[in-house]
């Protein structure tokens, strides 16, 4: 007679010995000063962002500008131009690079792009949030040398980008206005000013590309 022999192994479900999976979030390192020049857009990229041709660098700086004595009131300095020393005073920034560009002697387009280095992402964030509170305090301003008057036509925040449009009063045809954009990425602030008869969102496009350049650096 045949004998049925039962196996000695358990007939229950075996316990898994596989360790649970974990997801690690990589935190980008702070950028350093030598990486700043590579964050700025080329003239060709600025051309594309502004819808023009022949943009060329007319000024390249390794420090912030000071035009505080050419306009009033002071609370509008951040809206009037990019990379202003008084705007960044006491912010804890470490270094800056900027390019100014236009498309010739009788230029119809102007751009300034600045990148400002902070020691940590937290200090860059603090400056950005302070700017988000300060920018709305400006409504109108004037250039004291030329006597031109300007007003803020638009001002909005989209995540980590501040954007504004300022318009010169009585500029004559076809008009003159400037786009402003401030972008936060890691420990870098990108600060952009673009001016033309119709700046649109050209400053935002340049700022977004600066942000992408920051994100590409690890």
Regions picked out by a protein language model, each given a short descriptive name:
Residues 4-7:
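C-terminal motif of bacterial Sec signal peptides marking the signal peptidase cleavage site
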Residues 61-64, 129-178, 217:
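Short Gly/Thr-rich strand-loop-strand
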Residues 91-128:
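A short acidic-to-branched-hydrophobic micro-motif
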Residues 109-112, 174-180:
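Short, surface-exposed coil-to-beta transition loops
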Residues 193-218:
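Surface-exposed amphipathic alpha-helical segments
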């Amino acid at each position: 007679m045949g004998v049925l022999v039962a196996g000695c192994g358990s007939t229950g479900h075996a316990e898994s010995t596989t360790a649970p999976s974990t997801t690690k979030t990589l935190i980008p390192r702070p950028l350093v000063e030598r990486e700043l020049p590579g964050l700025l857009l080329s003239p060709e990229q600025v051309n594309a962002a502004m819808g023009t041709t022949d943009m060329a660098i007319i000024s390249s700086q390794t420090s912030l500008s000071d035009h505080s004595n050419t306009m009033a009131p002071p609370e509008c300095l951040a809206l009037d131009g990019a990379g202003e020393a008084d705007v960044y005073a006491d912010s804890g920034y470490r270094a800056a690079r900027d390019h100014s560009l236009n498309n010739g002697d009788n230029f119809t387009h102007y751009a300034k792009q600045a990148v400002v280095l902070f020691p940590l992402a937290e200090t860059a964030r603090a400056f950005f949030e302070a700017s988000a509170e300060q920018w709305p305090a400006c409504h109108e301003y004037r250039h004291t040398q030329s006597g031109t008057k300007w007003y803020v036509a638009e001002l909005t925040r989209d995540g980590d980008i501040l954007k504004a449009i300022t318009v010169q009063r009585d500029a004559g045809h076809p008009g003159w206005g400037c786009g402003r954009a401030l972008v936060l990425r890691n420990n870098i602030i990108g600060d952009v000013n673009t001016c033309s008869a119709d700046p649109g969102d050209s400053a935002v496009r340049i700022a977004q590309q600066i942000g992408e350049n920051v994100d590409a650096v690890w």
